[in-house]
């Protein structure tokens, strides 16, 4: 009898979902987001990420040995080991303001994060040290093994987009922060291994503050779309002061890691800033609603069901993260036009946020990796 009752409850729940149901971020039926490869979401914070990308290549989220994020050790631990990046080998950042002309800067809800991209040749960049004498075996992460007096060259890393995670993905000495910003950079010069594109990511942590909203975040948060697979153009004249989003104290921890979302490709050079920026309680709540749980109701009649309309929405040329090529990989076209996939009548649903959400991956084992501290001067 108990089993029969349980089955009846399940059947009633499924029947109820035909009219209204709660969907976690990344699964909303009104989504117009692209689908490439196996579906994934942050429901279990990456613990169930086993699948393949759109080309049929297996993700390495569960098998990789240099995965991100990690729990960053305390300063004293790194100082005690002498694990430091020499001043002359430290990464340098230069980010002028991002300026929208009304269509050149977008805030995108892609069903996995809130992301900012641009369609013009932004002059921002970072420069990363590499060995002065480099060959086809050298990689973007070689700075981790360079000694203070080693002769160095530099490569330019061009930012292609930035996005957010809540709560933070990296931990500092076990501490979790409410928000983390990732600025994704691409390197295509000098190193043979980077001809198809190498990636470096700069992570900025945010801590809650009792004061007013952080004005640096407001142009983004004021334009966050709530619907997955859609974007908002920043109004003409709106600026994002990306350089000021970097902490004034630019001490950072650096290590070799991976993408924090499928396919979790490895070989990335990570920089995690150790001084957090600030975010207000209201801004944090707004972000968590944008990636929150949705209650969706179907407005489609039985007659409509056989006449699903297909919707396609064009985004723009942008750097699309697929996988980090190995030194022997063929060059890939990372800049391409992305068309949001056809969906079975997503407009047949009305959805509203009903609970706060999250979009972070759990920390991964360091597995003996080299982790170094840069004391910025």
From Swiss-Prot:
<feature type="binding site">
    <location>
        <position position="182"/>
    </location>
    <ligand>
        <name>Zn(2+)</name>
    </ligand>
</feature>
<comment type="similarity">
    <text>Belongs to the alpha-carbonic anhydrase family.</text>
</comment>
<keyword id="KW-0862">Zinc</keyword>
<keyword id="KW-0479">Metal-binding</keyword>
<comment type="function">
    <text>Reversible hydration of carbon dioxide.</text>
</comment>
<feature type="binding site">
    <location>
        <position position="163"/>
    </location>
    <ligand>
        <name>Zn(2+)</name>
    </ligand>
</feature>
<keyword id="KW-0574">Periplasm</keyword>
<comment type="subunit">
    <text>Tetramer of two large and two small subunits linked by two disulfide bonds.</text>
</comment>
<keyword id="KW-0325">Glycoprotein</keyword>
<feature type="glycosylation site" description="N-linked (GlcNAc...) asparagine">
    <location>
        <position position="101"/>
    </location>
</feature>
<protein>
    <recommendedName>
        <fullName>Carbonic anhydrase 1</fullName>
        <ecNumber>4.2.1.1</ecNumber>
    </recommendedName>
</protein>
<dbReference type="InterPro" id="IPR041891">
    <property type="entry name" value="Alpha_CA_prokaryot-like"/>
</dbReference>
<feature type="domain" description="Alpha-carbonic anhydrase">
    <location>
        <begin position="38"/>
        <end position="318"/>
    </location>
</feature>
<feature type="glycosylation site" description="N-linked (GlcNAc...) asparagine">
    <location>
        <position position="135"/>
    </location>
</feature>
<dbReference type="GO" id="GO:0008270">
    <property type="term" value="F:zinc ion binding"/>
</dbReference>
<feature type="glycosylation site" description="N-linked (GlcNAc...) asparagine">
    <location>
        <position position="297"/>
    </location>
</feature>
<keyword id="KW-0456">Lyase</keyword>
<dbReference type="InterPro" id="IPR023561">
    <property type="entry name" value="Carbonic_anhydrase_a-class"/>
</dbReference>
<dbReference type="InterPro" id="IPR036398">
    <property type="entry name" value="CA_dom_sf"/>
</dbReference>
<keyword id="KW-0732">Signal</keyword>
<dbReference type="Pfam" id="PF00194">
    <property type="entry name" value="Carb_anhydrase"/>
</dbReference>
<feature type="binding site">
    <location>
        <position position="165"/>
    </location>
    <ligand>
        <name>Zn(2+)</name>
    </ligand>
</feature>
<feature type="disulfide bond" description="Interchain (between large and small chains)">
    <location>
        <begin position="296"/>
        <end position="351"/>
    </location>
</feature>
<feature type="signal peptide">
    <location>
        <begin position="1"/>
        <end position="20"/>
    </location>
</feature>
<feature type="binding site">
    <location>
        <begin position="260"/>
        <end position="261"/>
    </location>
    <ligand>
        <name>substrate</name>
    </ligand>
</feature>
<dbReference type="InterPro" id="IPR018338">
    <property type="entry name" value="Carbonic_anhydrase_a-class_CS"/>
</dbReference>
<feature type="disulfide bond">
    <location>
        <begin position="194"/>
        <end position="198"/>
    </location>
</feature>
<dbReference type="GO" id="GO:0004089">
    <property type="term" value="F:carbonate dehydratase activity"/>
</dbReference>
<keyword id="KW-1015">Disulfide bond</keyword>
<dbReference type="InterPro" id="IPR001148">
    <property type="entry name" value="CA_dom"/>
</dbReference>
<feature type="disulfide bond">
    <location>
        <begin position="61"/>
        <end position="264"/>
    </location>
</feature>
<feature type="binding site">
    <location>
        <position position="260"/>
    </location>
    <ligand>
        <name>substrate</name>
    </ligand>
</feature>
<feature type="active site" description="Proton acceptor">
    <location>
        <position position="112"/>
    </location>
</feature>
């Amino acid at each position: 009898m108990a089993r029969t009752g349980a089955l009846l409850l399940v059947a009633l729940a499924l029947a109820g979902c035909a009219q209204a149901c709660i969907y976690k971020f990344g699964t909303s039926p009104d989504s117009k987001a692209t689908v490439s490869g196996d579906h994934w979401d942050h429901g279990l914070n990456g613990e169930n990420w086993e699948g393949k990308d759109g080309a049929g290549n297996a993700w390495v989220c569960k098998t990789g040995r240099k995965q991100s994020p990690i729990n960053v050790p305390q300063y004293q631990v790194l100082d005690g080991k002498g694990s430091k990046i020499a001043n002359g080998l430290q990464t340098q950042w230069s980010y002028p303001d991002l300026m929208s002309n009304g269509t050149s800067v977008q805030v995108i809800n892609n069903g996995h994060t809130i992301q900012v991209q641009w369609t013009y040749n932004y002059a921002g960049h970072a420069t990363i040290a590499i060995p002065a004498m480099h060959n086809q075996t050298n990689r973007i992460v070689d700075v981790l093994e360079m000694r203070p007096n080693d002769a160095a060259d530099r490569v330019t890393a061009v930012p292609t987009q930035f996005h957010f995670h809540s709560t933070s993905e990296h931990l500092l000495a076990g501490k979790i922060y409410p928000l983390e910003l990732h600025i994704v950079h691409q390197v295509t010069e000098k190193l043979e291994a980077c001809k198809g594109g190498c990636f470096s990511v700069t992570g900025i942590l945010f801590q809650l503050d009792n004061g007013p909203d952080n004005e640096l975040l407001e142009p983004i948060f004021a334009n966050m779309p709530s619907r997955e697979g859609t974007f908002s153009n920043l109004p003409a004249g709106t600026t994002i002061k990306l350089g000021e989003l970097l902490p004034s104290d630019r001490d950072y921890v650096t290590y070799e890691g991976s993408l924090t979302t499928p396919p979790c490709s490895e070989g990335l050079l990570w920089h995690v800033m150790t001084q957090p920026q600030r975010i207000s309680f209201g801004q944090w709540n707004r972000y968590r609603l944008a990636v929150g749980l949705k209650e969706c109701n179907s407005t489609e009649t039985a007659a409509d069901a056989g006449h699903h309309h297909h919707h396609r929405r064009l985004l723009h040329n942008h750097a699309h993260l697929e996988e980090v090529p190995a030194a022997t990989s063929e060059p890939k076209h990372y800049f391409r036009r992305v068309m949001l996939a056809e969906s079975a009548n997503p407009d047949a649903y009305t959805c509203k946020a009903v609970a706060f959400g999250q979009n972070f991956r759990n920390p991964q084992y360091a597995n003996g990796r080299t982790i170094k501290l840069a004391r910025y001067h």
